[in-house]
Amino acid sequence: MQMVEINSKNVDSITREGKTYLYFTAGFSPFAAAMEQVYQKFLMEAEQYDVKVCRINVTDDIALGERFHVKDLPTMLVFRDGMRVHTTEGIVLPEHYTNLLKFY
């Protein structure tokens, strides 16, 4: 797993090759706060895979959230070789994020 710093200017080059997971969150969101432990577990699981993981705080990069039409927090977008292949919004079970690693 590779943690990658991402912004509106480099998102296309980062998601272009391989598997990339964009995790949109915000400090003001109680739902995102509730999912923090699930996200941390996802990071531990992701270490076993050849993937890029990017955490985006929508209050810091509003344009990136708008570009991907992020409406609910947290939101996980999955990209494979530049194509968006999956979207997960809101609170989910920990197994859901783990399954994203296995299936995408």
Predicted regions mapped to residue ranges:
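N-terminal "domain-start" segment that seeds a small globular fold
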Residues: 1-13
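Short active-site neighborhood of thiol/selenol oxidoreductases, capturing the structured segment around
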Residues: 15-28
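Mid-chain, well-packed structural core segment of small domains
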Residues: 58-75, 80
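Thiol-based oxidoreductase modules, predominantly thioredoxin-like and allied folds used
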Residues: 3-6, 24-25, 43, 47-63
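Non-catalytic, surface beta->alpha helical segment in thiol-disulfide oxidoreductase systems
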Residues: 72, 77-104
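CheY-like receiver
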Residues: 13-14, 64-68, 100
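Short acidic active-site motifs
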Residues: 9-11, 60-64, 96
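Typically the conserved alpha-helix immediately C-terminal to a functionally engaged Cys/Sec
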Residues: 31-47
